[in-house]
Design a protein with these regions (language model features):
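Basic/aromatic-rich interaction segments and small domains that mediate binding to polyanionic partners
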Residues: 2-70
Length: 70
């Protein structure tokens, strides 16, 4: 799973937060940039609001953005 996530979300991938199970989570809809994937399969994200909370695979949800995503 980790290798799949590394291929699907390479460093620099832009994402939008859909769901995060954390009381300190950025607001839903916040966008950020993936900086890597850790050994547990969590996406390491620098959120545009300055937060650095990871996205936990299977718990949290992000939308992968591309140039056509609004």
């Amino acid at each position: 799973m980790v290798e799949f996530l590394k291929r699907e979300y390479p460093s620099g991938t832009r994402v939008r937060l859909i769901r995060m199970d954390d009381s300190q989570a950025p607001p839903l809809g916040t966008e950020g940039t993936v900086t890597g994937v850790d050994d547990m399969g969590s996406l390491l994200v620098v959120w545009d609001n300055g937060s650095h909370l990871n996205v936990i695979h299977g718990v949290d949800e992000v939308q992968k953005l591309n140039k056509d995503t609004k």
